[in-house]
Amino acid sequence: MSNTPHVPMDDAHLKQYAANAAKELKLSGTVPCRRLSGLLRDSLKKVRRAQELLSVWCRAQSALPGAVEWLLDNHYLAVREGERALAALKRGRPLRGTERGETLLQCCARSALWAVPDLHQGRLALYLEGFQSVCPLTERELSLLVPVLAGTLVGQLAGLCGDLEGLKEGKVSPEEMAPIFGGLRALSGGEWTALLEGASRVERVLVQDPSGHYPRMDEDTRRRYRQEVCRLAKKYRLEEGQAARRALELAKKGEGPRRHLGWYLYREPLGKPEHPRSGVSYGLAVTGLSLAAALALWRAAGTPLAAVLLILPLSDIVKNVLDFLLVRLVPPRPVPRMALEGGVPREGRTLCVVVSLLTGEDSGPKLAALLERYRLANRDAGPELRLGILADLPDSGTPMGAEGAAWMDSARKAISALNEKYGGGFYLFFRTPAFSQRDERYMGWERKRGALTELVRLLKGRPAGLEVKAGERGWLRQVKYVITLDADTSLNVGTARELTGAMLHPLNQPVIDPKKKVVTAGHALFQPRVAVELEAANRSFFAKLFGGLGGVDPYGSTASDVYHDLFDQGTYTGKGIFSVDAFHTCLDSRFPDNTILSHDLLEGSYLRAGLLGEAELTDGCPWQVYGYYARLHRWIRGDWQLLPWLGKRVPDGHGGKEANPLPPLARWKILDNLRRSLSPVFTLLTLVLGMCFSGRVFAWAGGVAVVAAAS
């Protein structure tokens, strides 16, 4: 039928034609995707070859046939769309086949192109409705429809290019070329998501989500939900529509978070609870493989001392190799998000604060300029996002005097000027330095951790040693989330809306253990991907060497992290978004004063941090060796201060002890940080002692040291 000339049809006849085309097909087995890829590669070769030969031939011609002009002017479309189709078909699972030896999708695409040659989306939707009334397409087939349509068009073009003499002699008419390139242009410039979602039988079930959340999720999250339905259908040997309906039926009977059908796709797939990984097996694997490597080194070096001293450097190699393999074997775990197309809603009211010291009269205006930049970069978040400076003064041996007051007043004036310029939306939070008995200096209580704790107390309406020096205080009462940044961290375009969208998703809502006061499911904190600022990364040769390329990756996708991908728990590094209520419940008065320098790991563990790899912040980095090692010293010192959290009982914020609420994975992270801090020491010690032994021992010690450092 597809070889006959196209005949215009009304809507009813179009649907009937599609249904008849489906009835003619008889399913038989599967066809590997590599067969489609092979056909498409051959077609692209023919098109490229024809274009090259005709480009040379046309130089000697005074006039060109119309079809040749079409090909030479538009061949790039065929190459571009063909390459995209090849990428989509790469390493795909087999597709359903027909008795003709082709895939069902190829037959569907060919008849669709005959019936709707201009690929008008409204008409194509009618065609798919008719076709699927007889033979429903799977989610995977729908996801590959556009690439297969492109491949079919490239195949048609290759057929015309096979007759070079006919092209040169004008036997191929321009009317044969026009619909092919018109179709490729439509595929290239069209937005196909709405069409494919409308044609999806699974989508029609999922949009009935009793909680009402599914239609308001972003496009990627909805697509992953459909993919999860397909995975579960395959696992339990169900039809995709049947699996989706089962999840919907369970959600209709559920209450609270279980009323969202996503619960029955991820938390209790089709009613069968999944048991989360604890991290014990991962820690045992690293430990066991490290011991095995040490025993092997003992035999190779001929002395147990080398094995004992090098077990920590060997563990560096083992862990890095294991993580490298796991990141490639385990698919990334994207975080579900709400779309927030109208901006941050009232129930997601968000305050973004830059935590910083005021070190001079110019500090406040500089920080205010940052806030203005962040506001302009995140206008899509709307009025429910506001920004502020969370300011302290540097440590001092005397109470705050006229100088400190002048610095604060300069910051207040800068924020007030922004409020006047933009009609509000900016804040200055300030803490007057208090005397610390331990340090015998005037300083902000518990530095950054204390500043955030007091900010949360202020937001919760509790007494706090924090003053609102500028900004509308009444708006703060209903703040639900806080984005915390350092002075050298940049909030990139659209990042605030992405962060809040992740926090608002029902599957990410934190579940707090009332006894332990830690988050046991969901996430109360998200850590975005952090890249190095482009300017900071190029400030010195040292920064280039240790800071990487720097800048924002505009083509970046979901980031991989072993902890998040395997255990649904990321690692907090001090920049991100957290829930005000969960922070107040889990962290207020939780830790002893003056004992914890590195609090990010503990906060992330208590709040069950997640990694939002789709969002990115940029941060500064040390540009001198001294700055790098000073920062490393602070980190290592802070890691060792967390040693008590490896035990059964840990200090609390009231001078007593409580049962350690940390899960095994969080304790492993603490232990791993301690191991990593000792590794260079043992490496150096082994190299020094290796010089006193045989050359073989020294060679093994040096080899392990180099590989450990490089890994």
Stretch-by-stretch model annotation:
Residues 101-142, 149-166:
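Active-site activation/catalytic loop segments of kinase-like enzymes and analogous catalytic loops
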Residues 64, 312-319, 323, 328-351:
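N-proximal low-complexity "stem/linker" segments adjacent to membrane-targeting elements
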Residues 171-280, 333-656, 660, 667:
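Internal catalytic domains of large membrane-associated glycosyltransferases
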